[in-house]
Amino acid sequence: MKAAEIREKFLKFFESKGHTIVRSSSLVPGNDPTLLFTNSGMVQFKDVFLGAETRPYSRATTAQRSVRAGGKHNDLENVGYTARHHTFFEMLGNFSFGDYFKRDAIHYAWELLTSVYKLPADKLWVTVYHDDDEAYDIWAKEVGVPAERIIRIGDNKGARYASDNFWQMGDTGPCGPCSEIFYDHGPDVWGGPPGSPEEDGDRYIEIWNLVFMQFNRDAQGNMTRLPKPCVDTGMGLERIAAVLQHVHSNYEIDLFQQLIKASARETGVADLANNSLKVIADHIRACSFLIVDGVIPGNEGRGYVLRRIVRRAIRHGYKLGRKAPFFHKLVADLVAEMGAAYPELKEAEPRVTDVLRQEEERFFETIEHGMSILEAALAELDAAGGKTLDGELAFKLHDTYGFPLDLTADVCRERGVTVDEPAFDDAMARQREQARAAGKFKATQGLEYTGAKTTFHGYEEIAFDDAKVVALYVEGASVGEVKAGESAVVVLDHTPFYAESGGQVGDQGVLANAATRFAVGDTLKVQADVIGHHGELEQGTLKVGDVVRAEIDAARRARTARNHSATHLMHKALRDVLGSHVQQKGSLVDADKTRFDFAHNAPLTDDEIRRVEAIVNEQVLANAPGIVRVMPYDDAVKGGAMALFGEKYGDEVRVLDLGFSRELCGGTHVHRTGDIGLFKIVAEGGVAAGIRRVEAITGDNAVRYVQALDARVNAAAAALKAQPSELLQRIGQVQDQVKSLEKELGALKSKLASSQGDELAQQAVEVGGVHVLAATLDGADAKTLRETVDKLKDKLKSAAIVLAAVDGGKVSLIAGVTADASKKVKAGELVNFVAQQVGGKGGGRPDMAQAGGTEPAKLPAALAGVKGWVEARL
């Protein structure tokens, strides 16, 4: 049974049991900022289990794409060397949200394994938590598993509930016992049943884990039963496929074998059991799906983990003799294997291929030099009998040649060498300390606030008359009052001030009453629904309990709103022009501009920029109203609203319809698209691999920009004595004139050089039968110097010549030696002799060479020494 069929049978089986098939969520968790990657099926349902989210179904089943590389779950160093470690894997799961519990979960699992997958019942063993009698009885009395194949697993980690068979989400929250199902490969394979001293062997392989969430643990460790217990199960597709295909290694299943063959094709390796091929086959899956989900290779966070995986794959290809980009060519093979199950992979194939190709090309620029340094260091270490690589060298490889530490460690491990990681960490810490730039620290986290939420009125109002001061902070500490001249954070019960969020800067303005005036320079969130006004008290004394009028800088807010609304229109226009792969990666919206970072692999062409501008300005001219609606998140997404990648949304979301754009957004916006006035892109560039940045301006800023541009065009036209409409034609004429004059100048220089050459020939001194000449040719360029040297060589027949010219404090040198003399006098050595004395260097052929220098004052003495230098070599 092939992996694709196993996946389909799993989902269809649970669908027949009343489960809703839910698509795999992104590898980048949208609901858990503490998690680097989605690493199990339950991640997308975490808020459902916690009661913070509801779904329209109580039973679900998924085939969840998962990654374990980096952070707590890091299998990277083992991948390719063991039978079951992967960076990317698929987790098959079924879930109950307060619906069925242990009995149905156990019976469903047994039915699928024995009746659908046709596994022999006598090959299956199960474990239960040691005091979970309910699960034990279901397995023994209802399913009929013999007692000798049901194993109770206790608290084997030194603390209550610290067991492989007791699952917990964290120190507090939902938790409960679990029951694992194992497959027995038989006595021909070494290993013992779970719980035995030999359990790490390969005979008994865990294939399915059934988690029964039935308790809630509080901060004191007390357990209370959940009113609606839940079920979370997980079965690795690769593991069950290995069992059903009668192989012992996941890399032997059909899915991996096709990728291993493709890796062998691209690297030219015949041995399909080679571990490096397994590494490459595994890594193309992780890399491709991470890019599908918007991760781009970079130097931090998820992007850095992706870069590590890509470069590890490249290094293994390099180890196999592949010294050119190859990894990206495997994307097509992956699409052939998994594109049907995951259409998003097939849709993104060109982009994934391009991102990987660019990353490969970037790494291949340095890998050879870095590998040679590492190989030399390992050879020296081996000769000295050492077993630890210097951490400083590992850091140099990381910092200069782009070798992630684990890639260096990977190479070392193959030689039985370890890396001095503490020394590496010290070097990294020193660099970070040196590179740390001073900047404004926006500290709102850590302020101890336990009062009521702030009521925000800024969507409708620019001022609020009776705002009460409910908290004050000076230098992070809560205070009762603030005096004139002090900087502080003010929390109000009501405010029109928008707090920085979603890329939009916070409002500025004033908090005032008859006796006090507090200038707000920035507005930030103290907590999710608590707004802090940062600024300075300009007069009076401000106390907790005071009532003030809170008024924003309305003109600044209006400019910011124009830019924010333009960002929405630009985002949609970029997707229309460049493709649906465009995803927002960051933004900054303030009163002056909008800065928008997005996923795209190539610079925008002038035509693409013009098309984006035209589309946005069409929307501006349409003067469409901005319509805001608050609705459930699922309804918003089903209605076509764009949810920004990586953002976390609540159950209720704010949807903004603006012209042809529909996005989830909590920012402030124009009432109609016409309020934007004018949209103009002023800059476009790259900020990281696969990430482009566009800056644009709107309204009066855009008008001033166009006016300034128009003024420069008019000034340029006037300087060239042309009308603005004729400017390009006139520039072309001037360029033609310049080329003609340069040609005339070249001819004159050549003629001058010819005449000077005749004069210079007379200055040559004969040394050992060779005419030696070292002279300065005033006003000559490099071409003229070369032509003059050639003519002098023809005229003098046997000669060693150095000619120099000085221009703008720089020295140009040309040396020429005739063929008969070049066996003893090399032009490259001769020109270097002079160049080194004038602060430069150079080189070339034995008969002709050139150099430069930066110290013209030393030129006469350097030329004077040429005769003696040549004489010494003849």
From Swiss-Prot:
Keyword Metal-binding: yes
Binding site for Zn(2+): 564, 568, 665, 669
EC annotation from Swiss-Prot or TrEMBL: 6.1.1.7
GO cellular component, one term: cytosol
BP GO terms, sorted: alanyl-tRNA aminoacylation; negative regulation of DNA-templated transcription
Enzyme's top EC category: ligase
Gene3D superfamilies tied to this protein: 2.40.30.130, 3.10.310.40, 3.30.54.20, 6.10.250.550, Bira Bifunctional Protein, Domain 2, Threonyl-trna Synthetase, Chain A, domain 2
Known catalytic reactions: tRNA(Ala) + L-alanine + ATP = L-alanyl-tRNA(Ala) + AMP + diphosphate
Function, in words: Catalyzes the attachment of alanine to tRNA(Ala) in a two-step reaction: alanine is first activated by ATP to form Ala-AMP and then transferred to the acceptor end of tRNA(Ala). Also edits incorrectly charged Ser-tRNA(Ala) and Gly-tRNA(Ala) via its editing domain.
Domain notes: Consists of three domains; the N-terminal catalytic domain, the editing domain and the C-terminal C-Ala domain. The editing domain removes incorrectly charged amino acids, while the C-Ala domain, along with tRNA(Ala), serves as a bridge to cooperatively bring together the editing and aminoacylation centers thus stimulating deacylation of misacylated tRNAs.
Entry protein name: Alanine--tRNA ligase
